[in-house]
């Protein structure tokens, strides 16, 4: 349908009037929240952790030296506006086929798009267009990070997928590299947000990895937006 000049201005004004929500997290909790939020007239930006190192994501980040695509894939699917079959295809996980076992097709597509566009950020941007995403999806950084946890017994456990299974109380968590730079667009999103949501998800493995990026943490602390955290 073609919009007249007046209709187009009304649509643009309607979008400008929407509350801007910046949501930080990873894992399945974030995707569940986004599926509900996209049904409402709000301007959503999801900023997704790049600390995942398990399963298909971990294999691709190790073999191809790219940020882990799994959490991003789930968020893209949650915010997509496509036929159900297309989303099912994007989320399909191979159960046989040798080296393909365990891989999600969406992860492989994001890896391929990273090769085509030259970096992970632009891959996510292009896939957002392909999937007609409602809102915006940003990786917290354009490179992978490793999450570490210092336990009460003094042990340092490395890897987001390994930390929960250690079974000891966590004293602190930190990233390597420590001086990782966020995607610049993330800073603009934080500064322009009316509401900042952290989570839902695991405090140590889904929420804190984003806050351990120094500039993201500083910008959230200084942002005038209302802030809420949903930690498990």
Residue spans for each PLM region:
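Short, Lys/Arg-enriched N-terminal segments with co-localized hydrophobic residues
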Residues: 5-14
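Catalytic-core regions built around general acid/base machinery
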Residues: 189, 212-223
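A short helix->loop->beta-strand "cap" motif at the edges of active sites that frequently abuts
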Residues: 42, 223-228
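Gly/lys/ser-thr-rich phosphate-binding loops in alpha/beta enzymes
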Residues: 13-66
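Active-site gating loop/helix substructures
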Residues: 143-200
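Electropositive, gly/pro-rich neighborhoods at or near active sites that engage anionic ligands
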Residues: 51-168
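Glycine/threonine-rich flexible loop motifs
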Residues: 201-213
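Structural motif
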Residues: 22-23, 197-199, 228-230
